[in-house]
Amino acid sequence: MYRRAAVLRTLSFLVATATLGSPPPASAAEADPTGGDPFRSFQWPDLRREFLGTAPVEFDPRVKVSGPVFAEDAMNVPISVSADGLQGIEQILVFVDRNPIRKVLEYFPAGERGTLPSVSFRFKLQQASPVRAAVKTRDGVWHVGGTLVDSAGGGCTVAGETRKDGSWSKSLGEVSAKLYPRSVAPGAGDAGAGAAASRLRLRVMHPMDTGLAGGIPAFFINRLSLRDAQGRELLRLNAYEPVSENPIFSFDFANPPAGKLQLVGTDNNGNRITGAVTGAVIGAVE
């Protein structure tokens, strides 16, 4: 009997010691290697640290990213980003989980001058991946949305058409643009709800080389700025290698900008980009 009691006391001590020495149970966030990512992407924790740092982050349905379910042309994947329900937007950052070059562009709309928080463009996709937009508001919070795009891939590691035929140098830096009316002003908010909205669609001729195709160094537009007739900046865009060749960008405004607009920019080789568009709207866009 005494031996049995001694054994039981010993077992009780060992159990208590093991319990005291074991770590506390992990929280749900700690146990999830994707950091709570809606796409369950293992790249997300690293992406958050790389692009968003230690700032607070929310997965927010008000940040809408639209793209094809399957991209037939991996060198020209259309993406539209809008954050109509958010106020006080400072920056929109677009990045791709599984691209060899993850950052696509940074967009800075001047909301106080009627520029809406929306942008459309095309980019190169290397393989199926979540495509994300992170929207920073004045309170320092990043609001994140995204969409999953499937693709056969390879868009980042092949040369563009104008690079293949050598025609890129003949049109380098040429700008064409039109301003169209829109019947609805998405996200007009304080900028003027119910106003006649407009969309600016512009193209800049440039090969936008990623540097990942054999023998072709990185060569891409890195900055564009649109200014009104008074020289005030309406928007600024920092582009990176994944943006498609001869990029086309679309920007929305709560009201048609008056007078002549001026586009200025540079590429990573220091070439200057300049172009003008009249404030008069032309035609119509759906």
Where are each of the predicted segments found?
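Short acidic/polar inter-strand loop motif in beta-rich domains
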Residues: T137-V144, T266-G275
